[in-house]
């Protein structure tokens, strides 16, 4: 499976605040089309990156506005479904009102050219956070659950530090250590590099 990354820039809004942010958007491609992961900020940029390839669907790792607010527009543009874990429904409604989405479930699988994309529910940064595992490519799209240097932020509403640590210990860090981690923001890392720092995360509290 071909994994493409590009960066978009815009605003993250939550709890009455607003911050500048750069987001990693991913396109998972094959002969059978593409899936768009977390399209953000700039619809024209996303459409240009996709080009004339058929879109199979849009998969969201969570429903903070910087990851999800383009999804209804792009879903309509391409005539495809938007997939989101329902535990993030309240956050989704803050950005997108009653726009429809298809609920994701833990261990759900998508397929592209015979290769699997497996969804793991990893709450903590938000209640409905998920990561996407591509075992054939030894890659994890971690959204905002895990970054190079630490877990996703848990200082805002609907987030919980103890829960994200549990998700890392019980789900993410059970994957092979050489699994490449492609996060929602910033640079890549590996499962092993971050698992080795779990005690540091816990000690510092973020």
Task: Describe these PLM feature segments.
Residues 36-38, 56-63, 82-86, 121-124, ...:
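Active-site neighborhood of phospho(di)ester-bond hydrolases with catalytic His/Asp-centered motifs
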Residues 107-109, 115-131:
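Pocket-forming structural segment of enzyme catalytic cores
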Residues 5-27, 93-99, 149-150, 198-206:
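Active-site-proximal loop/helix segment associated with metal-binding centers of metalloenzymes
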Residues 21, 34, 41-116, 196-200, ...:
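Active-site HxH/HxHxD metal-binding segment of metal-dependent hydrolases
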Residues 2-53, 131-143:
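Conserved beta-strand hairpin/beta-sheet module of binuclear metal-dependent hydrolase folds
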Residues 41, 65, 88, 124, ...:
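Short, glycine/acidic-enriched loop or turn micro-motifs at the edges of active sites
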Residues 11-17, 34-37, 58-61, 118-121, ...:
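Short, flexible loop segments at the rims of nucleotide/cofactor-binding pockets, characterized by
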């Amino acid at each position: 499976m071909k994994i493409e990354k590009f960066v978009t820039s815009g605003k993250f809004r939550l709890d009455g605040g607003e911050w500048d942010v750069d987001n990693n958007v991913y396109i998972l491609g094959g002969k059978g089309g593409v899936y768009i992961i977390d399209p953000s900020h700039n619809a024209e940029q996303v459409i240009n990156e996709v080009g004339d390839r058929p879109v199979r669907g849009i998969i969201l790792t969570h429903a903070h506005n910087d990851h999800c607010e383009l999804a209804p527009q792009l879903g309509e543009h391409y005539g495809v479904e938007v997939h989101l874990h329902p535990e993030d429904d309240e956050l989704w409604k803050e950005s997108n009102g009653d726009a429809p989405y298809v609920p994701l479930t833990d261990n759900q699988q998508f397929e592209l050219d015979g290769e699997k994309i497996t969804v793991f529910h990893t709450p903590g940064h938000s209640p409905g956070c998920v990561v996407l595992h591509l075992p054939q490519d030894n890659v994890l799209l971690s959204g905002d659950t895990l970054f190079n240097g630490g877990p996703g932020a848990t200082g805002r509403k609907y987030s919980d530090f103890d829960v994200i640590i549990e998700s890392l210990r019980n789900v993410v860090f059970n994957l092979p250590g050489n699994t490449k981690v492609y996060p929602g923001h910033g640079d890549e890392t590996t499962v092993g590099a971050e698992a080795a720092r779990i005690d540091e995360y816990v000690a510092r509290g973020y």
